[in-house]
Amino acid sequence: MRAYLAPCGLGLGHVRRCEILLKRMREHKPVEGFFATYGEGFSYIKKAGLRALRVRDFKIAMKPNGEVDVERTLRELGYGLKFVGLVGKQLAQDVRYMSAIGPDIVISDTRAVAVMAAKLLSLPCVCIVHQIRIYIPRKRRMLRVSRLAEAGLVATLGPIWLMADAVFVPDFPEPYTISLMNLRLPSFFDGRFKLVGPMLEKRPEELPSQEELKERLGVEPEEPLIFMPITGMKWEKPFFVKKMVPILSKLAEKEGLKVIVSFGRPDRGEEVAFEKGGLRALYWVKDFYACLKACDVLITRGGHGAILEAMSYGKPMLLVPPPSHTEKMLNSLRAKEVGVAKVLLQHELAVKTVGKALRALLEETSYKRAVGESMRIASELDAAGVVAREAVKLASG
């Protein structure tokens, strides 16, 4: 059986989901996997030794502080004209690859063009998506253009996702749904998207105890451990690293915290970047789930996958969404609303504010209760298994 997996290449969350799904599909029958993606996603797949097919990049312009540059992004896309050309080129590549490979199933993770290509070739298709409604940041100079672009994306993308034979949203059921705002759509879409829960490669019960994992990392069981994997697009990472690492280094010394930072650089392996006092910075953490279970608090940028993984492992979070990144901002505010996280805006970052937030997350029982409940719910769900079974079923006709 051949599977054509088409994840969005911005960041690593989408490709990791597809990698998990391929492993679960192989529990049912032998599967050859072909990953058609771009950007960081393509680099990750190549590094992992999987079959990687490059498609045309889609880039988002960023400011030096990690903020999404809405005006420049729209301008570089020719206010839609260049974007149409990019879509056409990507569609041609997908059609060419699919025609050559002859896949039994196409799996798109937030890549609408692959769904279109699959339907043009009459191939069965599964779609994974958690952001169905796109909110574009509203800047005064670009207000009209932003509104038009937002309306156009909702009107275009929604029907494309529905072209797939099955559409899955990898998120918690209510009241713990993190992508709730991004799923608010006209009634036409009601019942067309299936909430299946978080997609995990490893479940908490498959790993050793938190105490044992801490000891393996050189941390005493009673010492508070903070884990900060630097996630998101490569253009937004440098500013956040320069801002947060000195703050955490001072807090490690002042508060007696242990901190592990991963720079999100799989190309460098698990090489130690530097170590100072209670803070250890690595280029990449191979066993993300071991560090997640070992930690007491996760610091992340509001990415959907990272939030769901932390909730599944019972870990409260400090979320720092990038400026003007509406999806991560909405994810973060929703996580705060359900009681599993505190949120700091990027301009609020300082030793005092971060220290206060971490103390609350470590000490206040309300956070432990909320993540305990989300962990219980996650233990009853198997999103990867549900999607894998449906993909194999569709591939088998």
Task: List the predicted regions and their residue ranges.
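C-terminal alpha-helical cap of glycosyltransferases
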Residues: 380-397
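A short, glycine/small-residue-rich beta-strand->loop->alpha-helix junction that serves as a flexible
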Residues: 7-19, 234-239
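Conserved nucleotide-sugar donor-binding subdomain of glycosyltransferases
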Residues: 70-105, 112-113
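Donor-nucleotide binding loops and adjacent catalytic segments primarily
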Residues: 22-27, 201-294
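Conserved nucleotide-sugar phosphate-binding/catalytic loop shared by glycosyltransferases and other
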Residues: 9, 27, 31-85, 229-232
